[in-house]
Regions:
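A short alpha->loop->secondary-structure connector
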Residues: 112-122, 136-142, 405-414
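Conserved "right-hand" nucleotidyltransferase catalytic core of DNA-directed polymerases
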Residues: 1-74, 119, 136, 146-370, ...
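Generic long, charged, amphipathic alpha-helical segments
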Residues: 421-435, 501-509
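Conserved beta-strand -> loop -> alpha-helix junction used to position metal-binding or nucleic-acid-contacting
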Residues: 117-134, 141-146, 421-427
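Conserved, non-catalytic sequence blocks in retroelement Pol enzymes and Pol-derived host proteins
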Residues: 131-134, 183, 389, 417-420
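Acidic beta-strand-to-loop metal/phosphate-binding motif
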Residues: 32, 97-104, 388
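Nucleic-acid-processing active sites and adjacent nucleic-acid-binding tracks
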Residues: 64-99, 230
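Short, amphipathic alpha-helical "recognition" segments used to contact nucleic acids or chromatin
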Residues: 437-449
Length: 509
């Protein structure tokens, strides 16, 4: 329930007036669009565009030489005829002009929620900003615009109005009278249009058109994916939740029998107390706090740490995974936010996709029991089956490819192996180094993904001296892996950046 608005003692002055006509924009080649919304669950559930638990309250449009904000559902009044505005807006969307947004996924999803589809190309200046600098501290329109066009967003009137009305200027903007929002909202579209003009020069300067076009062409498919979502078996999820709670309760009782008290499985001090009672040694951090890593608990020969680890795994499966599925379920489907590029909402600096609300990539895979159990809650479409596809040793192939281009020692044997058939890189490295395949694979992938020495030792399950000896032997007999890593590091240090085959830049300033 919304709290009542406090009546302002002084109304902030504004010169903004709503548009007096609905212009014909079909002759314009570029149209910038920005929506203002009421999206009450945005911070906890993600965009409400699919759930439709919010609404569009106003539409800002800008073209060369003209701009306007069309309020249609401000609680504080001052709205235009909703049906008239939406009919006009649909005509705008159907023009062949390129539609320009900042954070297009948000606005385009709300446009889809309104029942409209966009004709013509879609440009996202946030994607452009991320490709130009994936390490920015902020990707807001205000931040990016200040850097590239030297103009930010003026929020003075909006902040003053929100203060007078006693509301949050961003989250509750929809509650204000439209005239107090119009200036702020309209400038979003104007700045987005100007920003795109500047970003084109930056894309050209950094030679990023190929990767920008790739991301741009991919975008409509991602919107479709978001709205399609993935089916989930809610009944099974609820039953699984109950079953896991029973198992977790039993494990807590088993732990109590050994320790003599109720152990808080996520509290280091509580676990330390239990270890002290049964006289088990444990590590401490540099600051002296008890340390109980997953690997330490899982591989410990005593029953107590094993039970604590198992209870943790079940608790995490129940709270992190199943509760998340139940929370984000919408009519039997999960509609995650897809983070195409790095942004303030998530994403990666490498261009790899990530998901949020919920994060589908966190679904466990390696646990022999919990992995299949949680994954079985996601069900394919009717008359379809899930397919599992993966590249065959993609990381090793890339390493060998680039190492062979540099003619690094030891690569020719691997190249010959790949050329002669379906070679097993990990086994070839194991044979070269005289170690087990499992150990070779752990070291291979650890080095390829920049795993630190301590983490690598933990993954190998060896004590420090034995692990260091094994890694040393690996580097002596398969030297090209470290040699390539060192060469790439030097190049990154010298130029401050590297470029992928697809043209994406990774900066190391």
């Amino acid at each position: 329930m919304n709290k009542p608005l406090q009546m302002p003692m002084f109304k902030p002055e504004t010169e903004w007036v709503p548009p007096t006509h609905l212009p014909d924009l079909k002759d314009h080649k570029e149209i910038a669009i920005d929506l203002e919304t009421r999206d009450p669950n945005l911070m906890t559930m993600g965009s409400g565009s699919v759930r439709r638990d919010g609404e569009v309250i106003g539409i800002a449009v800008a073209v060369e030489g003209w701009s306007g904000y069309f309020p249609i559902n401000h609680e504080g009044g001052g709205n235009m005829d909703r049906a008239l505005v939406l009919d006009w807006f649909e005509e705008v969307l159907q023009t062949t002009a390129t539609k320009i947004f900042h954070n297009a996924m948000y606005d385009v999803s709300w446009i889809r929620s309104m029942g409209f589809y966009i004709n013509g190309g879609i440009i996202d200046t946030m994607i452009a900003a991320s490709l130009c600098n994936e390490n920015r501290w902020s990707y807001t329109l205000d931040s990016v615009a200040k850097e590239y066009i030297g103009v930010g967003k003026s929020e003075k009137l909006l902040v003053e109005a929100a203060k007078e009305w006693g509301i949050n200027p961003k989250a509750e903007m929809w509650r204000l009278p439209a005239p107090l929002v119009g200036e702020y909202a309209e400038q979003d579209a104007v700045i987005t249009l100007k920003l795109w003009a500047a970003m084109q020069h930056e894309i050209e300067k950094q030679d990023l058109w190929d990767v920008f076009n790739l991301e741009t062409n991919l975008f409509p498919c991602l919107v479709d994916m978001k709205f399609k979502g993935v089916r989930v078996d809610i009944d099974k999820a609820e039953q699984t939740k109950k079953s896991l709670l029973v198992s977790e309760k039993q494990m807590h009782q088993d732990i109590k029998k050994i320790a003599g008290f109720d152990v808080e499985i996520w509290a280091g001090a509580s676990i330390a107390k239990a270890f002290d009672i049964v006289k088990l040694p444990y590590d401490r951090t540099e600051k002296g706090a008890p340390s109980f890593t997953k690997n330490f608990l899982a591989t410990h020969p005593h029953e107590l740490p094993k039970l604590i680890n198992q209870a943790r795994e079940i608790n995490k499966a129940s709270t992190t995974f199943i509760d998340t599925i139940l929370k984000h379920n919408h009519k039997g489907r999960i509609h995650s936010d897809i983070n195409q590029i790095r942004s303030d909402d998530g994403g990666t600096v490498t261009g790899r996709f990530s998901y949020s609300n919920p994060n589908l990539q966190q679904i466990p895979a390696r646990h022999k029991e919990l992995g299949p159990l949680i994954r079985s809650l996601f069900i394919p479409e009717e008359k379809c089956k899930w397919g599992c596809f993966d590249y065959s040793q993609q990381e090793p192939r890339l390493v060998v490819h680039f190492a062979s281009l540099l003619r690094l020692e030891g690569t020719q044997t691997i190249v010959d192996g790949y050329n002669s058939g379906d070679a097993d890189f990990h086994q070839m490295i194991a044979d070269m180094a005289g170690i087990e395949r499992k150990q070779a694979k752990t070291i291979n992938l650890g080095l390829m993904y920049g795993m630190g020495k301590n983490k690598l030792m933990a993954e190998l399950g060896l004590l420090k001296e034995a692990a260091e000896k094994l890694i040393k032997t690996y580097h002596q007999r398969a030297p090209f892996v470290k040699m390539l890593s060192d060469a790439v590091s030097r190049r990154a240090d010298d130029s401050g950046k590297i470029r992928t085959i697809g043209g994406r830049l990774c900066h190391f300033d």
